[in-house]
Amino acid sequence: MDLPGPIHDFLLVFLGSGLILGGLGVVLLPNPIYSAFSLGLVLVCTSLFYILSNSHFVAAAQLLIYVGAINVLIIFAVMFMNGSEYYKDFHLWTVGDGVTSMVCTSIFVSLITTIPDTSWYGIIWTTKSNQIVEQDLISNSQQIGIHLSTDFFLPFELISIILLVSLIGAITVARQ
């Protein structure tokens, strides 16, 4: 989106703070309904980021798939769960929470320090997308496919692994 600099910067800060607050709401709110609505806020802010970066197709796909389908499905599933079981024996902070937060913080710090210094193009299965075809000769959908299979191959695969683990966790919780 072609906006003047101060307006663009204000929108970036506003959407970034919406993402941070929504993410904290997803993790910290004890009521799963409120967490699901916070997840909806995060997904809407993400799609607005895509609109700011002139990726209208990806923004529309984000809204339709994640907000329109997956978040509604999560809210629907949470509505069927027994809400009173979340508040039984609710302790604000336990030893396991402290250990988990320390482990997550150390992993986060190590990733933040490692990822910017890593050259992902030295890995054998990634090539630069401009080596494949000229960018002017292909459509936006083809460019998205090329970027997913070249520049963003590793993050795309990591997201698929995270989704697989969350699906296995959901099946395990549903069986209990």
From Swiss-Prot:
Lineage, opening ranks: Eukaryota, Viridiplantae, Streptophyta, Embryophyta, Tracheophyta
A molecular-function term among this protein's GO annotations: quinone binding
Keyword tags: Chloroplast, Membrane, NAD, NADP, Plastid, Plastoquinone, Quinone, Thylakoid, Translocase, Transmembrane, Transmembrane helix, Transport
Catalytic activity of the protein: a plastoquinone + NADH + (n+1) H(+)(in) = a plastoquinol + NAD(+) + n H(+)(out); a plastoquinone + NADPH + (n+1) H(+)(in) = a plastoquinol + NADP(+) + n H(+)(out)
Membrane topology, as annotated: Multi-pass membrane protein
Gene name of the encoded protein: ndhG
Coiled-coil region: none
Function: NDH shuttles electrons from NAD(P)H:plastoquinone, via FMN and iron-sulfur (Fe-S) centers, to quinones in the photosynthetic chain and possibly in a chloroplast respiratory chain. The immediate electron acceptor for the enzyme in this species is believed to be plastoquinone. Couples the redox reaction to proton translocation, and thus conserves the redox energy in a proton gradient.
Protein name as it appears in the record: NAD(P)H-quinone oxidoreductase subunit 6, chloroplastic
